[in-house]
Amino acid sequence: MAAAGAGSGRAAVSRSRPPPARFRGCLAGALLGDCLGAVFEGRSVVKLPDLLSFLRGLEPPGGEGEPAGSARRETLSYTDDTAMSRCVVQSLLAKREFDEVDMAKRFAEEYKKEPNRGYGMAVVNVFKKLLSPQCSDVFEPARAQFNGKGSYGNGGAMRVAGIPLTYSDVQDVKKFAKLSAELTHANSLGYNGAILQALAVHLALQGEVSRETFLEQLISHMEDIEADDKSLTDARALGFEDLPFSRRLKKIKEFLELSSVPKEDVLFELGNGIAALRSVPTAIYSFLRCMEADPDIPEHYNNLQRTIIYCISLGGDTNTIATMAGAIAGAYYGEEQVPPSWEQSCEAFQETQKMANSLHELYCQQL
């Protein structure tokens, strides 16, 4: 069990108390991104007219006086992204702190209960080992993956939102994001992606901030995180340059200074794949890009909706990129931008709201 350290200076630092609407927005945004994105997952090309037509189908029939979302209530299923995100949240709420043994057990039991949520084969092997009575170290199965190199996929990042919704101290956010990811992703390119995603949600939760300041803070954190020996060794072993996440954040900064960026450039530089390095920066770029209007997306969609639409339009690992961007945007804009017709079309949306309220209570207790 890993509790937050008293030495982190929590008592000496006055921390803001974000409103519960941001917590509900974060988990709702993540759920929307997963459920909506899953419909288009794996497509190399997602045509925007097809996506917009699908979204119009979520609206209730006009003129019938039905409540929003009633036409397609809970018809969109969530995937392993949300299943594992829920495990993170449920563990934090049950234990009132990060507990690696409890969280690992919940991951494995959730897979055993519902194995058809779209889990990758590699992580299934980890779950099977975690379910074994002989497993004495819950981090060992992940360390053994890929001949001891560990996974650098985006699975740690996609589920991490519960960490910054529990811990207000940025050092705790980094520490427990890393530990939660290491239960399945032992390569630094995997867990550093989870840290980056957690930091993005943490910053978004604090409220209004410029795109420049948001990126500068992320770059500052990641340059420090990626300078350790393991991060440098792992990146070089996989043929990447040093500080790969930091470099992509700087590329995002360049993109945001341009009047327009073709989708092809975004895919080439940032990606739309299952590696954390090829998806977490993409989610962050999507959030920041969609702070402003997009000429290709109808104006009646708000910032949160625009963010999710843009993510899905990139194709590839649509649900994971959209769930990460949705969590960031939801934390930033709050539940006010969560359209009822979208939310109520998603499986377990009411449970998600309840979990968000409980996380807000836990977060405030730790201030």
Curated annotation (Swiss-Prot):
GO terms for cellular component: mitochondrial matrix; mitochondrion; nucleus; site of DNA damage. Its EC number is 3.5.1.-, 3.2.1.143, 3.2.2.-. The gene is ADPRS. It comes from the Eukaryota. Binds 2 magnesium ions per subunit. ADP-ribosylhydrolase that preferentially hydrolyzes the scissile alpha-O-linkage attached to the anomeric C1'' position of ADP-ribose and acts on different substrates, such as proteins ADP-ribosylated on serine and threonine, free poly(ADP-ribose) and O-acetyl-ADP-D-ribose. Specifically acts as a serine mono-ADP-ribosylhydrolase by mediating the removal of mono-ADP-ribose attached to serine residues on proteins, thereby playing a key role in DNA damage response. Serine ADP-ribosylation of proteins constitutes the primary form of ADP-ribosylation of proteins in response to DNA damage. Monomer. It is found in: Nucleus; Cytoplasm; Chromosome; Mitochondrion matrix. Belongs to the ADP-ribosylglycohydrolase family. One of its GO terms (molecular function) is O-acetyl-ADP-ribose deacetylase activity. One of its GO terms (biological process) is negative regulation of necroptotic process. Mg(2+) 1 binds at T79, D80, D81. Pfam families: ADP_ribosyl_GH (PF03747). The record marks E41 as: Glutamate flap. Its cofactor is Mg(2+). Mg(2+) 2 binds at E41, D317, T320. The protein undergoes a dramatic conformational switch from closed to open states upon substrate-binding, which enables specific substrate recognition for the 1''-O-linkage. The glutamate flap (Glu-41) blocks substrate entrance to Mg(2+) in the unliganded closed state. In presence of substrate, Glu-41 is ejected from the active site: this closed-to-open transition significantly widens the substrate-binding channel and precisely positions the scissile 1''-O-linkage for cleavage while securing tightly 2'- and 3'-hydroxyls of ADP-ribose. This is ADP-ribosylhydrolase ARH3. InterPro entries: ADP-ribosylglycohydrolase, Ribosyl_crysJ1, Ribosyl_crysJ1_sf.
